[in-house]
Regions:
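Alpha-helical segment of the N-proximal tetratricopeptide repeat
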Residues: 33-63, 67, 110-133, 137, ...
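Start-of-helix register in tetratricopeptide repeats
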Residues: 38, 73, 106, 143, ...
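"A position-specific structural signal for the A-helix of alpha-solenoid helical repeats
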Residues: 42, 77, 110-114, 147, ...
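Residue at a conserved register position within TPR or TPR-like alpha-solenoid repeats
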Residues: 47-48, 75, 82, 115, ...
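Structural motif corresponding to the intra-repeat A-B loop/turn of tetratricopeptide repeats
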Residues: 50-51, 78, 82-85, 118-121, ...
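Single-residue signature of alpha-solenoid repeat helices
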Residues: 56-57, 88, 127, 161, ...
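Solenoid-like repeat scaffolds
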Residues: 62-67, 96-102, 132-138, 167-174, ...
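Alpha-helical adaptor scaffolds
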Residues: 110-118, 149-150, 331-370
Length: 423
């Protein structure tokens, strides 16, 4: 089951620098009279800009909230670093109430982020337009451009994301985080060694104890584009060690790292390793602090991964049982489960395609996420097997032209590029 994870949204929600750092243009007026609150806010923002996460940020968030309980942006930031997601949402909603009496910039920013903060951010794209307007009215506010860049990345609009990050760097001060996202744009441009060199340079500037998500996953993607599976996995294993050492695994389970390793193994024919990684990742869920509905979602993702792995193993009956389990979970989830139907059709299409039932696979694959390059890859394979060459070629072209920022593009792009040149 696939969806923008809460971790991505938390990271996207927390970027900023001192308003006084803006080189030109109007920026937010902070609605607090507490110098201590401003100091703590800047310290927390600086840590995030340097990929410093974990318990120290949680404590900073608590101190920030206590230093001025009526400071809307301070409470907002406290909500971002709060590991208990129910409490984080409660704090965010409180910041919205406080924002009604805050400055125009603070109020509009906090309200614009509602789509990225509630319901696990499933409608995060709706936050983009109000932030664009906010950026036009406050051209010197770096925070807005950093958030826009990440939301554009999440929406598969890499060029717009890069423009936003460049604006943020121009406003200043320059940061490792923005540089890492710009290195990610080099990947979309096909400049893999250059992107790795940028990541390595950025890493050297980081303080000890940093946990550079964007760097480790970016390096992984660069190796996937070049077909170097072992190097791709090595980067994620390094990140797993850093994630644990920082205590982040006590805030959000390490399952997403294992699932990424599982998927890389799966799509490169390392099926036993894939199954073990999916199962190992899920072990971090039952005793975690996640709300029960999110634990259920991750259980669904385990069944999803097992289904695809079993299908690749040729165990088609077992695979379909897993697919039916996912389908039942979605139905049982009622209204909340409806968002996962595209993920189910991707799964069913995957299983049917592996079983040689291409016509049935196509029926499902036409109902998947058309913005997901890997879903599109399966659709292209189905079209090609059915002799529908023009439609296959169009699908492969769509993958090559995609600007999706996640793991799906590096998994799909090499095959799509090769097929596009040979069909």
């Amino acid at each position: 089951m696939s969806k923008k994870p809460a971790l991505f949204l938390a990271l996207a929600a927390a970027i900023g620098v001192p308003a006084s750092a803006a080189t030109s243009g109007k920026h937010f007026e902070l609605t607090t009279k507490s110098p201590e609150a401003v100091k703590l806010l800047r310290e927390l923002q600086g840590r995030i800009e340097n990929f410093q996460f974990g318990p120290p940020n949680v404590e900073l968030g608590k101190k920030l909230a206590a230093s001025d309980p009526n400071f809307a942006l301070g409470i907002y930031y406290a909500s971002v670093v709060e590991p208990n997601q129910d409490e984080a949402l409660k704090q965010y909603q409180h910041s919205r109430e406080l924002a009604k009496k805050a400055s125009d910039g603070e109020r509009r920013f906090i309200e614009a982020m509602v789509h990225a903060r509630v319901n696990q951010g499933v409608d995060f794209k709706k936050s983009i337009d109000p932030l664009v307007g906010l950026g036009q009215d406050y051209p010197g506010e770096r925070l807005v451009q950093m958030i826009l860049g990440q939301l554009y990345n999440g929406d598969g609009k890499g060029d717009l994301a890069a423009d936003a990050f460049r604006k943020a760097q121009a406003i200043g001060p320059r940061s490792a985080r923005a540089e890492a996202f710009l290195a990610g744009h080099e990947l979309l441009e096909g400049h893999y060694p250059q992107a790795r060199a940028q990541y390595e340079s950025i890493e050297k500037s980081l303080p000890k104890g940093s946990v550079p998500f964007a760097i480790r996953f970016g390096v992984t993607f660069s190796h996937l584009y070049e077909g170097n599976v072992d190097a791709a996995l090595a980067s994620l294993k390094t990140y797993l060690d850093e994630y644990r050492a920082s205590g982040l695994d006590q805030q959000f389970p390490e399952v997403f790292i294992w699932n990424a390793m599982a998927r890389i193994n799966l799509e490169n024919g390392r099926l036993e390793e894939a199954m073990k990684a999916y199962e190992k990742g899920y072990e971090s869920i039952p005793n975690s602090k996640l709300p029960e509905d999110q634990k259920t979602t991750w259980l669904g993702r385990l069944h999803h991964g097992k289904c695809r792995t079993l299908a690749r193993m040729g165990k088609h009956e077992e695979a379909w049982k897993e697919a039916e389990t996912v389908r039942k979970m979605i139905i049982d989830g009622g209204e909340a489960g409806r968002q996962y139907w595209k993920a189910y059709h991707y799964l069913a299409g995957y299983a049917k395609l592996e079983a040689g039932q291409t016509g049935e696979a196509l029926e499902h694959l036409l109902q998947t996420d058309e913005t997901d390059p890997f879903h599109t890859l399966l659709l292209a394979r189905a079209y090609e097997r059915l002799g529908r060459k023009d439609e296959a070629k169009a699908a492969y072209k769509k993958i090559v032209e995609s600007q999706a920022a996640g793991i799906e593009r590096p998994l799909a792009y090499p095959e799509a590029k090769e097929k596009l040149s040979s069909l």
